[in-house]
């Protein structure tokens, strides 16, 4: 019962995080966007956070459905996420193309509904979520110029506009 509750909480993060955080102009979101755009170490930490969520999902799902072979199929995706360089490259490539984002979203929905492929769908959902919150090239190029802002509102507006472009 506890594993089922943990599994539901972990899976619900895919739905609740974008709802409360994506495109918001709060101070926490602006700080998150600025740190992700400026620091390679923060992007690596973000990749490791994604890996931890995927592994936690696998552990709870395997405890619930022991005879299911779905976690074995999605383990390949989890193994790909172990290397920070590959994770960053994967997230950057997914973020760069709207058609790839749409394809992975549709694939995640289809595999979630397919028998035995639920874990693959949730893993793809986590990868899609991480790619959406990954900084765009626009903000990375803008931050390299070290712009000077006169007030916080200007920083907030530019950050949110360029980060999610």
Which residues make up each language-model segment?
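Membrane-helix interface and helix-disruption motif detector
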Residues: 1-8, 56-73, 90-93, 110-125
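N-terminal signal-anchor/start-transfer transmembrane helix
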Residues: 3-30
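Hydrophobic core of alpha-helical transmembrane segments in multi-pass integral membrane proteins
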Residues: 14-18, 50-56, 76-79, 128-130
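Cytoplasmic membrane-interface regions of multi-pass membrane proteins
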Residues: 22-37, 80-99, 141-147
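Membrane-helix boundary elements
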Residues: 32-67
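Small-residue-rich segments of transmembrane alpha-helices in multi-pass membrane proteins
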Residues: 43-52, 97-113, 153-160
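Alpha-helical membrane-associated segments of multi-pass integral membrane proteins
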Residues: 95-148
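Short, highly charged, low-complexity non-transmembrane loops/tails of multi-pass membrane proteins
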Residues: 138-165
């Amino acid at each position: 019962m506890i594993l089922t509750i943990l599994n539901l909480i972990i899976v619900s993060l895919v739905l609740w995080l974008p709802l409360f955080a994506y495109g918001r102009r709060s101070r926490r979101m602006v700080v998150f966007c600025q740190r992700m755009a400026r620091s390679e170490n923060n992007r690596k930490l973000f990749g490791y956070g994604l890996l931890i969520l995927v592994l936690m999902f696998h552990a709870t799902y395997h405890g619930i459905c022991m005879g299911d072979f779905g976690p074995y199929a999605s383990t390949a995706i989890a193994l790909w996420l172990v290397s920070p360089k590959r994770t960053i490259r994967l997230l950057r490539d997914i973020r760069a193309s709207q058609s790839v984002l749409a394809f992975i979203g549709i694939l995640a929905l289809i595999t979630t509904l397919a028998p035995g492929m639920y874990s693959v769908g949730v893993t793809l959902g986590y990868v899609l979520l991480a790619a959406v919150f990954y900084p765009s090239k626009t903000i990375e190029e803008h931050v390299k110029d070290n712009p000077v802002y006169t007030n916080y509102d200007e920083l907030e507006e530019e950050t949110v506009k360029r980060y999610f472009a």
